[in-house]
Regions:
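Class I (Rossmann-like) S-adenosyl-L-methionine-dependent methyltransferase catalytic domain
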Residues: 1-104, 120-206
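Short catalytic micro-motifs in class I SAM-dependent methyltransferases
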Residues: 115-119
């Protein structure tokens, strides 16, 4: 039976002290990290953010606390989320894989996809990553956990893939790893130094 991302799900994993993981202070630090990375590589203040698989949009408030004028747009596959928060938090209905064909009238300085990819099937991941690479102006924050990580929280439907699987998928999409779950848009590739990338350059002797 498919998982249902309804109010009961979000109440359990985000508000119930017996199950919720991640403190508000930790989220604020994560948001600050992603904003700083994007602004560093863009060389200017953050203008807009696309939050994919945003749930109830927990990133929105800390983003706006840091950058009050930022244009925030969320996407989620939950009917509950869009019905309840779609208008007030600017959340549209979309699955991750639909990013392959979904486009907006702008590219995004920061694209966020936090705690989503490890619940998806390979074909949907690859399709969505192609869309992220096409829409990213600056940095994509792709927080994903692997078979080498100790994972807390919702394990239903969790795919414990090797880190190398994701690195290949990100590389195939043209995304460049710069550390701490951050990946540079392909168009930034010529503007960065070799050691800013969190990988060995191709052909490097070991």
């Amino acid at each position: 039976m498919p998982k249902t991302y309804d109010q009961a799900y979000f109440d359990k994993w985000y508000r119930d002290p017996a199950h919720a993981v991640g403190a508000p202070a930790a989220l604020r630090r994560k948001v600050a990290l992603a904003v700083a990375q994007a602004e560093y590589y863009l060389g200017r203040p953050l203008r807009n953010v696309l939050d994919v698989g945003c749930g109830e949009a927990p990133w929105r408030a800390p983003l706006r606390a840091l950058r009050p004028g930022v244009d925030y747009r969320g996407l989620d596959a939950s009917q509950y989320v869009v019905a309840r928060y779609g208008r007030s938090r600017n959340i549209g209905l979309a699955r991750f894989g639909q990013l392959e064909h979904l486009r907006f009238d702008t590219r995004f300085d920061l694209i966020v996809c936090s705690d989503v990819l490890h619940y998806l099937k390979p074909a949907e991941i690859r399709a969505g990553l192609a869309g992220i690479a096409g829409m990213a102006e600056g940095v994509a924050f792709l927080e994903v956990f692997t078979s080498r990580d100790g994972v807390d929280g919702d394990l239903e439907g969790f795919h414990a893939r090797a880190p190398e699987w994701y690195l290949r998928a990100f590389a195939d999409a043209g995304l460049l790893p710069c550390g701490s779950h951050c990946y540079l848009a392909p168009r930034l590739g010529r503007r960065i130094a070799a050691l800013e990338l969190a990988r060995l350059p191709a052909g490097t002797a070991r």
